[in-house]
């Protein structure tokens, strides 16, 4: 009996969490390794290269359910149309996101194209502005869900229909985002970068219930702010503190992190990374990574600190990213450097 009640409470908890996901955007703990999702002005902002390719994967709630929540992304961007006289260039990029909640009852697929312009301001600073234009599809299948009306005190009666009446099982909409970045690099040992962005500028309508236009079925704009920095302590060690804040309607999230990159090979071709992040009142996130030439792999694990740790044993989510950046022209024998200022060992 106690086991049945506990199971019922857990199902209700995850049902409430699923409802919360309906109104929240996809996110990664490794926000610094998902640049186009963090800010569209990051398109073409690529230190040490003129192109970048990356993949992210997040697996959440695997410790308490056989059907965890999975979030995946692929992205790529490059620098084009450089203007050496004006010290500016254009960045182009693309981003695809896919999220599957639980047994697949709620899925979200998004695709964005990004464009940004980057302008050097004197010798040691850079200003960037960018825009994302994308298309989003969200689908739901209520057959895999259990509802409170199906709970009879001992178990869920699957023969009782407790699902709400939906007008449609999917929602499609155009989505617009914009962002602004500023970078300051007074010398080859200090790099500071901060930016702000606004998502859902057009406030698209997302609803499975209502066909009419109303404030209640429109997405709230999401405001993001981030800060990255790197300090080269010597030819072997770089320390990178960072922070991230996001606000959407009444939901907010604050994160801080610090990473240490160690030049294991001496010439910068092999790096070892260790870091620690903290999501306010929610989780602590250790990170480990290794870099080989232009490729960096980073693994992180969300250790739950909130009240949910009673259900998941503090095992929140694991996440990894794979990012490659390089220079296209070096393969054509020209060796042109990236327009973006470099920061290396």
Residue spans for each PLM region:
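DNA replication initiation on ssDNA origins
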Residues: 1
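Sec/Tat signal peptide C-region and signal peptidase I cleavage site
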Residues: 18-23
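Subset of outer-membrane beta-barrel
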Residues: 24-345
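Sec-dependent N-terminal signal peptides
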Residues: 4-17
């Amino acid at each position: 009996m106690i086991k049945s009640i506990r199971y019922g409470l857990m199902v209700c908890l995850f049902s409430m969490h699923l409802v919360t996901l309906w109104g929240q955007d996809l996110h990664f703990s490794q926000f610094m390794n998902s640049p186009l999702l963090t800010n569209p002005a990051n398109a073409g902002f690529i230190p040490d290269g003129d192109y970048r390719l990356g993949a992210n994967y997040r697996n959440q709630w695997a410790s308490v359910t056989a059907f965890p929540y999975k979030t995946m992304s692929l992205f790529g961007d490059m620098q084009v149309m450089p203007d050496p006289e004006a010290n500016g260039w254009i960045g182009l990029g693309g981003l695809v996101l896919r999220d599957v909640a639980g047994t697949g009852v709620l899925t979200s697929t998004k695709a964005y194209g990004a464009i940004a312009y980057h302008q050097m301001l004197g010798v040691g600073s850079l200003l960037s502005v960018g825009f994302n234009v994308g298309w989003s599809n969200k689908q739901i299948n209520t057959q895999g869900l259990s509802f409170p009306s199906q709970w009879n005190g001992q178990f869920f009666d699957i023969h009782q229909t407790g699902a709400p009446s939906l007008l449609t099982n999917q929602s499609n909409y155009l989505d617009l985002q914009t962002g602004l970045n500023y970078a300051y690099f007074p010398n080859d040992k200090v790099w500071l970068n901060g930016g702000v962005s606004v998502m859902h500028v057009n406030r698209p309508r997302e609803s499975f219930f209502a066909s009419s236009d109303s404030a209640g079925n429109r997405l709230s704009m999401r405001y993001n702010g981030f800060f990255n920095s790197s300090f080269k302590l010597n030819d072997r060690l770089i320390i990178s503190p960072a922070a991230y804040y996001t606000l959407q309607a009444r939901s907010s999230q604050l994160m801080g992190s610090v990473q240490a990159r160690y030049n294991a090979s001496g010439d910068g071709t092999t790096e070892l990374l260790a870091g620690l992040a903290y999501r306010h009142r929610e989780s602590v996130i250790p990170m480990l990574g290794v870099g080989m030439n232009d490729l960096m792999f980073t693994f992180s694990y969300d250790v739950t600190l909130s009240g949910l740790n009673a259900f998941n044993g503090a095992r929140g989510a694991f996440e990894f990213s794979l990012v490659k950046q390089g220079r296209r022209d070096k393969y054509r024998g020209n060796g042109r450097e990236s327009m973006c200022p470099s920061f290396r060992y």
